């Protein structure tokens, strides 16, 4: 039998009697095979590219909002009235929707629908490509060739987490697009963020944020954080610029680029990200070099945000010691930031933080903080003109040195502060006499497709020219 004969192949001649011609044996013909060109990925990718909708086909870019380390954000509106998002069904499948249980019954409901939803407005985040180019590397036509090394870890994290999470206090992703090696994440649009609101109340004149608004915003932040923690996720970058608020006063936690699952990590938290949380909102255990930490780092950040809502300025505004670019494996000791914390909360001791001696930077801490500072939080609270004892108690519970006894997000939701009048609402703006200005949009910089970089619009915190001493 000829070795090329395969009785299981229907394309071969299956009968021995048919393999002769005029009594002379013939050689079986091989099976019909697709050409290598058809089997390669190129034609398939080309066909997919032809049917894939582009970002400009689906969305009209209204203007440019801001830039950060991740990339750029644009305001846009749908060209299809929200009825044909390619990934909408994908976003609604396999979502986790726990965390809105009985505790939410205490929140006053409102009938105001978000105007952002009615007008189908979106925020489109364009991630920076993880690429590098060589000026001496050109094609045969003399055009510069850009080599792409892949998708950033931050983009992968945010995409994977946002597609699985569904909670009204977490910013919702409605679409993900890949075009020309750029990734676009499309989120529901929020007209405000806490940084913008704080700046409105502090400039040019100081106008304290009403207690009702602070209470409603804080409760909704804690509700979103509770949802994340119940799903084994910590945010790791909570700060005012990452807390969005819709025009109807609903809080949305955004920017999950540093968020991470903590129930079964593939590598240690420190190995993956040596520096997490913006310096002013970074928990003391992180400042002391903790290699392993817990979701309590998010609660410290919430405490810092609450204090900032109360006082209209960061409570611990330290200066960050930068990483030595020649030794990126070494994280510098953040003496100045710890100094700001100690001045308000007092010097931590083994009495109020028994495990402090276990942290890698404890010896450096002892060296720089030989003098003992007394607790000063009550004086700080009185100085800013606040009077609620329960609010002060919640703040103390959130800004607890020892992470093992720091209040959890779930317990904070039922703190006495939220039970006393005025009762909070899902509309944080309810009853306000003023309306907050809309987010600033740069309409002359709306080219979302180009790779040009915008500067001076980062939203990481206060610029020096945006802060001043509060009038006493």
Swiss-Prot record:
GO BP annotations listed: negative regulation of filamentous growth; negative regulation of transcription by RNA polymerase II; nuclear-transcribed mRNA catabolic process, non-stop decay; positive regulation of transcription by RNA polymerase II; protein destabilization
Pfam families, sorted: Pkinase
Major location category of this protein: nucleus
Residues of the Protein kinase domain: 59-418
EC number(s) given by UniProt: 2.7.11.22, 2.7.11.23
Entry cofactors: Mg(2+)
Ranges of biased composition (kind: Polar residues): 1-23
A molecular function GO annotation: cyclin-dependent protein serine/threonine kinase activity
Entry-linked PROSITE patterns: PROTEIN_KINASE_DOM (PS50011), PROTEIN_KINASE_ST (PS00108)
UniProt catalytic activity: L-seryl-[protein] + ATP = O-phospho-L-seryl-[protein] + ADP + H(+); L-threonyl-[protein] + ATP = O-phospho-L-threonyl-[protein] + ADP + H(+); [DNA-directed RNA polymerase] + ATP = phospho-[DNA-directed RNA polymerase] + ADP + H(+)
Binding site for ATP: 65-73, 125
Gene Ontology cellular component list: CKM complex; mediator complex
Keywords attached to this entry: Activator, ATP-binding, Kinase, Magnesium, Metal-binding, Nucleotide-binding, Nucleus, Repressor, Serine/threonine-protein kinase, Transcription, Transcription regulation, Transferase
Active site residues according to the UniProt entry: 237
Function: Component of the SRB8-11 complex. The SRB8-11 complex is a regulatory module of the Mediator complex which is itself involved in regulation of basal and activated RNA polymerase II-dependent transcription. The SRB8-11 complex may be involved in the transcriptional repression of a subset of genes regulated by Mediator. It may inhibit the association of the Mediator complex with RNA polymerase II to form the holoenzyme complex. The SRB8-11 complex phosphorylates the C-terminal domain (CTD) of the largest subunit of RNA polymerase II.
Homology family: Belongs to the protein kinase superfamily. CMGC Ser/Thr protein kinase family. CDC2/CDKX subfamily.
Subunit structure, interactors included: Component of the SRB8-11 complex, a regulatory module of the Mediator complex.
The protein, known as: Serine/threonine-protein kinase SSN3
Originating species: Debaryomyces hansenii (strain ATCC 36239 / CBS 767 / BCRC 21394 / JCM 1990 / NBRC 0083 / IGC 2968)
Gene: SSN3
């Amino acid at each position: 039998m000829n070795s090329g004969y395969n009785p299981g192949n229907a394309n071969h001649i299956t009968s021995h009697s048919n393999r002769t011609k005029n009594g002379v044996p013939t050689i079986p013909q091989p099976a019909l095979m697709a050409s290598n060109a058809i089997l390669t990925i190129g034609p398939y990718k080309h066909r997919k590219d032809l049917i894939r909708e582009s970002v400009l086909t689906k969305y009209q870019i209204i203007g440019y909002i801001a830039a950060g380390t991740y990339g750029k954000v644009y305001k846009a509106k749908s060209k299809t009235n929200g009825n044909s998002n390619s990934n909408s069904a994908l976003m609604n499948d396999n979502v986790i929707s726990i965390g809105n249980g009985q505790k939410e019954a205490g929140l006053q409901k409102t009938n105001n629908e978000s105007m952002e939803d009615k007008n189908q407005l979106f925020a489109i985040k364009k991630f920076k490509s993880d690429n590098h180019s060589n000026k001496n590397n050109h094609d045969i036509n003399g055009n510069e060739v850009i080599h792409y090394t892949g998708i950033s870890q931050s983009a992968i994290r945010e995409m994977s987490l946002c597609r699985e999470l569904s909670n009204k206090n977490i910013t919702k992703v409605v679409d993900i697009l890949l075009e020309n090696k750029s990734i676009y994440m499309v989120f529901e649009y929020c007209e405000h963020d806490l940084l913008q609101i704080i700046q409105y109340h502090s400039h040019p004149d100081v106008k304290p944020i009403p207690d009702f608004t602070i209470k409603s915003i804080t409760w909704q932040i804690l509700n979103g954080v509770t949802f994340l923690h119940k799903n084994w996720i910590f945010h790791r970058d909570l700060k005012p610029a990452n807390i969005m608020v819709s025009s109807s006063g609903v809080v949305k936690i955004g920017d999950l680029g540093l968020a991470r699952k903590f129930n079964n990590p593939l590598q240690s938290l420190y190995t993956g990200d040596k520096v997490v949380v913006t310096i002013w909102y970074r928990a003391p255990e992180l400042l002391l070099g903790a290699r392993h930490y817990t979701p309590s780092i998010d609660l410290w950040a919430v405490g810092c945000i609450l204090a900032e809502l109360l006082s209209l300025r960061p409570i611990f505004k330290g200066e960050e010691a930068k990483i030595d670019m020649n030794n990126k494996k070494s994280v510098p000791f953040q003496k100045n930031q710890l100094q700001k914390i100690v001045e308000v909360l007092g010097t931590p001791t083994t009495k109020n933080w028994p495990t402090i001696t276990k942290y890698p930077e404890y010896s450096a801490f002892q060296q720089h903080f030989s003098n003992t500072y007394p607790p000063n939080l009550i004086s700080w609270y009185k100085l800013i003109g606040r009077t609620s004892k329960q609010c002060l108690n919640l703040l103390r519970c959130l800004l607890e040195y020892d992470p093992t006894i720091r209040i959890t997000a779930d317990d904070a939701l039922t703190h006495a502060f939220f039970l006393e009048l005025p009762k909070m609402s899902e509309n944080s703006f309810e009853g306000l006499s003023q309306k907050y200005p809309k987010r600033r949009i740069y309409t002359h910089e709306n080219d979302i497709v180009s790779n040009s970089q915008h500067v001076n619009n980062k939203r990481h915190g206060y610029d020096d020219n945006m802060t001043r001493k509060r009038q006493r």
